[in-house]
C-alpha cells in the first residue's frame, strides 16, 4: 500500500512475514527523503519498546531500493479497532498502553509529531498497542524535517503553524485520541487539559499519568465516603465500574 511518499510491502523471508517500508518511485533517489528514511530507522532503533513496532534493519531490496525492515503485526489499526465493539475496560487497557509507551518515547528525547489512530496497531492476540510510524518523528540531534508536520484534526495548533516542537504537541494529539476512545471519568477530565493552549497543558506524559491516577483515587475515595462501596458486596464491582488507569 502507498502512504504519502512511502510504500508499505508485506514480504516473507525464512518462513516469517515482515513489513518493508520503502520510498515511493518519485522520491526514491532524492537524498532528502533517503535521509528521512535513515532518520526514521535511527529513531526507531533508539526507542525500542514493546509498544513500538520492532525495526530490524535498513537494507537494499530489488525493485524498491532502501527499505526499513520491520516486524509484521497481526492486528488492526487503532482506528479500525475503535470501530469494533469493545468494553470500556478494554478501551482503558489500550489507553493505558498508549500513555506508557509515549512516556518512554518522550523520555528518550523523541517527539512523534503525527500521533493518530491510523499510526497505531492493536494486536489480535493479547490486545497490545504498538506505534507503527515514526516518519515525522523528531529529536534535537537531527537537522532535517524541522518544518510543520502532522495530520489535520490531530496536530496541535502551534505545531500546525510551525511553532515550537516538544512533547506538549504530542500531548495535544493524545487528548484528541482519548476523546475518541470514550473512556472513564478520570480520563475524560484529564484529556480536557491536553487540549488547552500550549502553556496550560501537561508539561510531560509523567505528569499526565500521575494526574489521571490521582483523579481515579479521588473518585474512589468519594464513593467510599458516600457509602457507595458499602452498598456493594465486594470492591470488584467498583473496580469494574471505573476501570483503574
Locations of regions flagged by a protein language model:
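AlphaC helix of the protein kinase catalytic domain
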Residues: 77-87
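AlphaC helix of the eukaryotic protein kinase fold
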Residues: 27-46
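Conserved short submotifs of the Hanks-type protein kinase catalytic core
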Residues: 63-77
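Conserved activation segment of eukaryotic-like protein kinases, specifically the C-terminal portion
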Residues: 145-158
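Catalytic-loop of the protein kinase fold
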Residues: 106-122
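Short beta-strand micro-motifs within the conserved protein kinase catalytic domain, predominantly
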Residues: 54-66
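Activation segment signature within eukaryotic-like protein kinase domains
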Residues: 94-95
Amino acid at each position: 500500500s502507498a502512504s504519502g511518499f512511502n510504500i508499505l510491502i508485506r514480504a516473507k523471508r525464512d518462513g516469517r512475514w515482515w513489513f518493508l517500508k520503502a520510498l515511493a518511485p518519485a522520491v526514491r533517489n532524492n537524498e532528502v527523503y533517503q535521509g528521512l528514511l535513515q532518520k526514521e530507522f535511527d529513531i526507531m532503533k533508539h526507542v525500542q519498546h514493546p509498544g513500538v513496532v520492532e525495526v530490524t534493519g535498513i537494507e537494499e531490496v530489488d525493485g524498491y531500493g532502501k527499505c526499513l525492515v520491520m516486524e509484521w503485526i497481526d492486528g488492526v489499526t487503532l482506528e479500525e479497532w475503535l470501530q469494533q465493539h469493545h468494553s470500556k475496560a478494554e478501551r482503558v487497557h489500550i489507553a493505558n498502553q498508549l500513555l506508557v509507551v509515549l512516556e518512554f518515547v518522550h523520555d528518550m528525547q523523541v517527539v512523534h509529531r503525527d500521533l493518530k489512530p491510523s499510526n497505531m496497531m492493536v494486536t489480535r492476540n493479547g490486545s497490545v498497542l504498538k506505534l507503527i510510524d515514526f516518519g515525522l518523528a523528531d529529536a534535537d540531534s537531527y537537522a532535517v524535517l524541522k518544518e510543520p508536520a502532522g495530520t489535520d484534526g490531530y496536530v496541535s495548533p502551534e505545531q500546525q503553524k510551525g511553532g515550537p516542537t516538544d512533547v506538549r504537541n504530542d500531548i495535544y494529539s493524545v487528548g484528541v485520541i482519548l476523546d475518541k476512545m470514550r473512556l472513564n471519568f478520570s480520563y475524560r477530565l484529564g484529556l480536557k487539559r491536553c487540549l488547552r493552549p500550549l502553556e496550560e497543558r501537561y508539561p510531560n506524559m509523567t505528569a499526565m499519568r500521575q494526574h489521571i491516577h490521582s483523579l481515579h483515587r479521588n473518585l474512589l475515595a468519594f464513593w467510599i465516603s458516600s457509602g457507595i462501596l458499602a452498598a456493594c458486596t465486594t470492591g470488584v464491582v467498583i473496580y469494574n465500574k471505573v476501570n483503574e488507569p
